[in-house]
């Protein structure tokens, strides 16, 4: 998830009330930066929301949500610290001097910061860094680096330049992702600028072997996606959805409706909506997708006024898959963005199945997010509602 701008000095005392039997993590956001993002998180997680210091801070309580970060003593960002791990320093410009580090942004899964350096010629340069712990964190950082590298190589003006990923030398089992720092404003991008770039990403990308998938596992949040190569989009998507359902079941346990709905989804709904894309002379081009392109994973560059995307978990997919993430209630990429996108890239045939396909793709996203937020029954009910609707229409 996107690491939003945050104020490094948080209120020491906050007037909040929390049920005593709920284990919580407290995440602070500067309210005026992105009120929509705050409320989006509340909608998708079912968390409690309250305001402290009107129009300045919002506190989100996320039940039992564990960050994948165990701390990095002596190397935390901010507080006057200018020390960075040798592995990170080796990836910064040769001969530079670190003049400041700051905690920058908020992430559910990682620690995020900004590193300011002075180059040999006296100019200043800034970098964004994300740090995460444990073996799983290594795979998460590798997947994000490869995703952002693939996007940046294809469209360098559409994503911050990824520089490196690696493992700290001074702290065991601590991993990082490093990229150029881009100062961004948290506003919706111009539909035409954004849609034209996204369409170009989809249209100009080329799967290295002509198949659907990716060359390594990528992570949406802190959970893996199924990226093994497949010739058929229908087969690939079914495996992706099955993986997400397995993760959701592991997180929240069984539900009687699963035994009724899931077989129909796989035996009837998926073939009904996806098989026509690859029959009667039709085919699906494997396009590079961001993989988690909701509003909070985009921004507008302060200097260029151009739209940017980040926090990618890429793979090669049907381009319309991207818009499954634009269907849930937390979405802010509305009909105008879809219509503008399709002025650059036409809807796949059969056109009459378009809405159904997007709702099927939405199920994949909603299943994954339900697996991420274990305590949220709202998200499971949302997922089951998606299944009921699809079964009623296409089962």
Where are these regions (language model features)?
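A glycine-centered beta->alpha junction motif in the catalytic cores
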Residues: 168, 172-189, 203, 242-246, ...
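An alpha-helical support segment within catalytic cores of ATP-dependent transferases
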Residues: 80-92, 167-170, 206-290, 301-304
């Amino acid at each position: 998830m996107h690491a939003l701008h945050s104020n490094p000095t948080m209120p020491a005392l906050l007037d909040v009330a929390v049920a005593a039997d709920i284990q919580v993590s407290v995440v602070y956001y500067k309210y005026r930066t992105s009120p929509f993002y705050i409320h989006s998180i509340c909608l998708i997680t079912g968390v409690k929301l309250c305001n402290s210091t009107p129009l300045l801070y919002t506190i989100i309580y996320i039940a039992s949500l564990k960050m994948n970060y165990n701390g990095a003593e002596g190397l935390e960002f901010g507080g006057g610290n200018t020390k960075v791990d040798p592995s990170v320093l080796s990836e910064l410009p040769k001969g530079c001097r670190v003049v400041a580090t700051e905690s920058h942004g908020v992430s559910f899964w990682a620690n995020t910061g900004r590193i300011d350096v002075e180059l040999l010629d006296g100019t200043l340069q800034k970098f964004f860094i994300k740090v995460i712990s444990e073996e799983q964190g290594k795979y998460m950082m590798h997947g994000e680096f490869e995703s952002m590298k693939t996007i940046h190589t294809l469209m360098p003006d559409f994503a911050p330049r990824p520089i490196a990923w690696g493992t700290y030398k001074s702290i065991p089992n601590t991993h990082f992702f490093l990229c150029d720092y881009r100062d961004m404003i948290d506003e919706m991008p111009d539909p035409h600028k954004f849609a034209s770039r996204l369409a170009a990403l989809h249209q100009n990308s080329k799967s290295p072997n002509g198949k659907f998938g990716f060359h390594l596992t990528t992570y949406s949040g802190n959970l893996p996606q199924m990226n093994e190569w497949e010739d058929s989009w229908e087969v690939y998507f079914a495996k992706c959805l099955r993986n997400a359902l397995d993760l959701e079941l592991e997180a929240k346990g069984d539900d009687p409706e699963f035994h009724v709905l899931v077989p129909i989804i796989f035996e009837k709904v998926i073939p009904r909506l996806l098989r026509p894309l690859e029959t009667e002379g039709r085919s699906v081009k494997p396009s590079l997708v961001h993989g988690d392109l909701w509003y909070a994973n985009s921004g507008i560059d302060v200097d260029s006024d151009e739209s940017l995307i980040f926090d990618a978990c890429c793979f090669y997919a049907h381009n319309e898959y991207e818009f499954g993430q634009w269907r849930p209630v937390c979405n802010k990429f509305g009909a105008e963005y879809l219509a503008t996108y399709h002025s650059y890239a036409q809807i796949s045939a059969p056109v009459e199945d378009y809405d159904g396909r997007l709702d099927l793709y939405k199920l994949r996203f909603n299943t994954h997010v339900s697996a991420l937020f274990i305590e949220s029954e709202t998200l499971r009910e949302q997922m089951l509602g998606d299944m009921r609707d699809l079964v009623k229409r296409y089962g």
